Amino acid sequence: MRAVAVAWRRRARYHGAVPLRVDEQPYPVIASVIDPRSETYRAHEQANRAAAEKLAAALREATVGGGDKYNQRHLAACKLLPRQRVELLLDRDSYFLELCPLAGKDVPGHVPGASLIGGIGRVSGVECVISASESTVKGGAMSELSVWKSTRLAEIAEANRLPSISMIESAGADLPNQSKIFVPGGRGFRELTRRSAERVPTICLVFGSSTAGGAYIPGMSDYTVMVKQQAQVYLAGPPLVKMATGEDSGHEELGGAEMHSQISGVSDYLAEDERDALRLGREIVAHLGYRKAAAPLPRQVLPPRYPAEDLLGIVAPDIKTPFDAREVIARIVDDSRFSEFKPSFGSTLVCGWAHLAGFPVGILANNGILFSESAQKGAQFIELCNQQDTPLLFLQNITGFMVGKRYEQEGIIKHGAKLINAVSNSTVPAITVMIGASFGAGNYAMCGRAYAPRFLFTWPNHRIGVMGGKQLAGVLDIIQREAAAKRGEPVDEQRLAVGKAMVEGQIDRESDPYFATARLWDDGIIDPRDTRTVLSIALSAAYTAPVRGTTSWGVFRH
C-alpha cells in the first residue's frame, strides 16, 4: 500500500458533508487536455513518484519515536506507546491528520516530529486537536521546536474553535536549552486559559510525569484525568523539595494521581490504567455536546472526474517549468466543476468557485507571474468571497510580481498592495497549498504563513524564499561589480565566482521544502495525491467555527 502523505492516520475515507439530495450542478466541468502518453507527462510522473517515495520514507521515520530500544523499554513498563494512545482515543475507523510531522527533521539536536505528536482527529464524533508527548524521546522533554509546534497546534485549535486533548508524559523543558524555551513556553499556558475563556474545551490526560511548568497544563485545563500509579504532577520533585525545604517526600504523596484526585483536587478523574484514561477522555468529549458553528448547504458530493494519480504527471518537479493550475483544480474539486471568475482578465491568476467534499470554496491559483490586472482581479474576488461567506483556497505557485520600468509606472506596487490588503483583512477561513514556487511578495499576496491561513500545506516540489538561488546570487554579483567600479578597483573574478556559488548553494538549501517544514514554515508536506483528502479534513475543521466574511478593508490606493 502506498504510504499516504498524511503522516500517520487511520485507514478511512473521508466523505465531507453528508449528501442529502442530488442538486443540479450549474458549474461547468473543467475539460482536461493532459496526455498521459506524452514524454513530458512520463518524465514528470517519474520524478514526482520518486519525490513522493522520499516523503513517505521521511514520514515513516517520524513515527518511530526514540527507536526500538526506548520503545521496548516503554512497553516493558506496561505503558502504551504515544501513537497507540492517539489511535485508541480516536473513533473507530476515523482519520488522524497529523500536523507538522517533520518539524525538527535534520535540525541539529532535534528528531523528526520535535518530540510531539499533533493533529486533528474525531473523538466521540467531535473533531479535536490532539497532542501527545513523544515520551520515548528524552522522556518527552520539550525543546524549543516542541514549543513552536505546540504553539502552532494551539493556534489551530483557537482559530477553528476545536476542543483540544493533550496527552502528557513529559520530563518538562529540555533544561540545557531552557533559555530557548522559558519565555515562549509561557505563552502556551496563557493560550490554554484564553481558549477556556472563549468556551473552547481543553482536556488533559496525564499518563506520566508532568512537572515544574508542565504541571500547569493539567492545572489549567478544563478537564484533567490522571492515571493511577503513573501520573506525577508537581511543581518540584522530591530532590528539589529536599534541597529547597529539607522535606523528605515520595513521588506519590507529593504529586501522585490518587493524591491529586482525593486531596488536592487538581485531578477531576482517576483512571485505573491508560486505557481507562482514554475511555474517560472520550466520555468527557461525548458529554460536551459540542457542535459546529457553521455548515454548508447540503449537496451531493461527487469525486473529481479525473484521477488524483494524474497530478504526478501534470506538475513539474522543476519550479521553472509552468503547468496549468486548472488541471490541478480539476483533480481536487467535486465533479471537476469550476465556475471561473473573469477568465479573460488578469489571466495569470485563476479565480473561481467550486465545491470540495461538499464545502464551497473560492479558489485563487497562480498561472504565472502576478501583473497589475491579476492583482486587481484577486482583490475583487476575495471581496466577493467575503461577501458570500465563502472560504478561500490558495494554490500557490508564484515567483513574485512583475518588475520593470513599464510596470512600476503602471502602478504594480499599488495594485499588488490591493491584493495583499484583501488577503490581510479577509475573515473567511483561508487554506493555502504551495504546489510550486513561493518567492518574494508573491508569498504574501497568496496567503503565505505570515498571513495566518487556517492551514498551510506544501507539495514535495515546493521551493520558498525571497527569490531563487541563481537570482539572488546574480543580484549580489551586480551589486559587488558596481561597488568595485565606484571604488575604481578591478573585480576579483575568482573570488566573486566562489562567493556566488556559496550564496546560491545556501539559498537552494534554505528554500528546500524539508528545510522549511522542519522549521514549521508550513503544517506539513503532503503527497499531491492526498490533497483532496487533506483539504476535506481542513475545511471540515474550519467549519467548526463561524464562517463569516467582512466588508471592512484597509485603504485601497487608486
Across the structure, where does each feature detected by a protein language model lie?
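N-terminal mitochondrial targeting presequence
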Residues: 1-22
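Ligand-binding clefts of soluble mixed alpha/beta catalytic domains
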Residues: 17-558
